């Protein structure tokens, strides 16, 4: 059950590093590596995320939902996809984290399957990790790699201590979970280093950092 927020008519798509010009620190970092032209036409974008409680709160990246007029979430249950709209509850551009909530119809008491944030404190270089997301709109894609480095600074902002991994991360993976081999969410996939897609250098926000923001 991994949502795919989609951007409304303003602004451009988000996936790995974003494409629009903006003064915030994350966008400045992205623009150094992705010198895209400003958007000329309204577009939609896709990203990833994951449900963190039974009420339908979803954790994702700020750049996935930034400026969206509408957020649409796709959830799969028993092999069938169901579409919901969602509301932005809060966001922090400095850490690139956003919290959205699925809009349920009156009388709908659906309890959503969810993932709990684990601890990234004891993560070690060389540990196996699994990334799940929606790269290029290919939902529920699973890739495997290792932790390549910890506390990696990439010049993205004031809170700049990423998990580096060689698990394949591409445009559309942003906001998706990074798991350890115990099945705990230890990171939020956020950025890649490379213009054309994954080159084995991806970055995830540690789960402990995300906890501090959403708490």
Predicted regions and their residues:
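Serine-dependent protease modules
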Residues: 1-215
